[in-house]
Structure formats: structure tokens, C-alpha cells
Amino acid sequence: MTERIFAQGWAGEGRGLPYCEAGSGETIVAIIGDGGLPTRAHALLAERGRVIVFAMTDAGSPQEAARRIGAAVAALGIERFDLMGEGSGAAAAMWLAQAPEAEIGSVVLAAPVSVLGDLPDEAFREIKRPVLVLSGTRGQSAAGDRYRSLLPDCHFMFVYEAGPAIGAERPEALAFIAREFFERCDLFLVSRENGMVFP
């Protein structure tokens, strides 16, 4: 059902990359794991903004995937966006966050499964954008701890009762946390609606 609200298209160099898009307004670019489809979390985010989802399908290394996704985003005429990387898409998101030409606001990494490979530790420390790393309490990985230790402006949060597929298992939680972080960064833990800390 979620897939029905997303339009599909192709963008970028050569034959382009497939993507799914829904909503309007400020843009969130999501890079999801191998062959994934948009989840209810993406649909919820699309209720208050434009969401473009790229899947890590045969895009090569995370570095190459980031380059191609960056070209596709530029071809779509998007100048500024927030970025979300989920699962194996987190590494590509961090490579994209390194691109000097990309005007990226904040970055959310949901259950990252790998580190950046060839990117040296110093390159992590040069990322000045706010980054939030989310880890499910039922599927923690060492990658989240590594991102936390290297990124200068990194926040970390557990999502309870979630494993490695936070967007599928806890879509409301992922959408709420990501939206709050994109909009409020350091103040995101306190909801504007009721002033309560997110559980």
C-alpha cells in the first residue's frame, strides 16, 4: 500500500537511477538498503515534505552510489535537502555528505550496517553537518558506535523494540525522530506538540 503513494522515475547520468517520490515542500533524500522499497516511515515523512527514495541496487561501492545519487538529485533540480541513510544505504549517505557541492542540511543514519570502507577517519571528522545515528535495541551494530566516535556533531538514539529494519518495524518512531531532527537538530528530543521527551 505504501508504494502506491510514491511515483516512480529515473534520473541522473546514463540511463539514470530509479527513484520513488512523494509529497511536496522541503526535500528529504533517503538512501535505503539493497532493493528496498519505501516504507510507511517514508510515507509519513511525505505528509509534510517531499521525499525521494533511492535504493542501493547494483550501484557499486558506497562511494560510487553516492556519486550517482548526487548526480540524480542534481538532475531533479534539488539544491538543498536533508539526507537519510538506512541500513546499507548509510555508508552511501555519508559519502554523499562529504561531497563539497552538496547542500545538505542534517543527516539521519538509521541502523547503519557498515562503515565507510576507504574513507579515512580524518574525512569523518571534516563532516560539519549535524548527524543523528539511530540503532534498534534488538539489532545493534558496531557501525553506529564507530560513527559516534568519529563524527564531530553526532547524536545517538536507541529506537526500542526495533531491529535492523527500523523503518519497517517502527515507522512512526523513525518518521517522528527524523522529522524532529531535520527541523530542530539539537532541540529535537523535545516534541513541539507536548514538550515531552520522545520515549
Regions found by a protein language model. Name each.
Residues 154-199:
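Catalytic active-site module of serine/aspartate enzymes centered on a nucleophile-bearing elbow/loop
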Residues 64-81:
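Conserved acidic catalytic loop of the alpha/beta-hydrolase fold
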Residues 113-123, 138-142:
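Active-site nucleophile elbow and catalytic-triad environment of alpha/beta-hydrolase enzymes
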Residues 13-60:
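Conserved HGGG/HGGXW glycine-rich cap/lid loop of the alpha/beta-hydrolase fold
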Residues 43, 132-162:
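Conserved loop-alpha-helix segment in the C-terminal half of the alpha/beta-hydrolase fold
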Residues 1-16:
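N-terminal cap/lid segment of alpha/beta-hydrolase-fold proteins
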Residues 79-115:
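Conserved hydrolase catalytic core segment
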Residues 55-59, 113, 162-163:
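Short beta-to-alpha linker loops that shape the active-site pocket of alpha/beta-hydrolase fold enzymes
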